[in-house]
Amino acid sequence: MLQSKLINGFGILKAIGQVKLLNKRIPAYCEWEITHYCNMSCAWCATLTPERNTADDLSSEKALDIIEQLSDLGTQMIHFSGGEPMLRKDLHLLITLAKQKNMMVALTTNGSASSEAMERVLHADMIRVSIDGTERYMEPTSFSFQP
C-alpha cells in the first residue's frame, strides 16, 4: 500500500496507464546519467572508473535535443543522475526545458554543490541527496577494493 502511494506521488502509475491506453510503447520514465564526472571517489560507485573524469559529456545542444525528443515521445518523468549532475553548468537549462515540456524532474546529487548552484535547480520536483554514512562507516572492512 505504501509503495502505491509513493508511486502515485511521482505520477508513474498515471504514466503507465497512459501507455496502456495509447496501446503503444513510450518511455514513461527516463533515468539519464547526464555526466560521468564526479568530485567524490566512493568505493561502491558504479561510475568509479579510470575514464570517468575524462569522458566527454553530451553538448548542451544535444542534451536539450534529447529532452525535446523524449517529450515528443510522451515521456512523463526524467531523472538526472551521474556521476555528479551538479557538475554540469547547463543542468538548470535541462531541468527548465523538461519542466516546460510538462515532465516531472528528479535529480540525484551528492550534495556537495554550492548553495548558489543548488538554488539554480530548486525547480526540480525531487532532489535526492545521497548520504551514505559517516567517514568511519564508509571505510570498507569486509572486502578489498582496488580502483
Identify the function of each model-found stretch.
Residues E84:
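Conserved G/P- and acidic residue-centered "switch" motifs that form tight phosphate/ATP-binding loops
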Residues T49, T54, P140:
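Conserved catalytic-core motifs of eukaryotic protein kinase domains, centered on the activation segment
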Residues S60-F80, R88-P147:
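Radical SAM/AdoMet-radical enzyme domain recognition
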Residues M1-T49:
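N-terminal pre-core extensions flanking Radical SAM catalytic domains
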Residues T35, T47, S81, T108-T109:
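Ser/Thr-centric signal marking residues that sit
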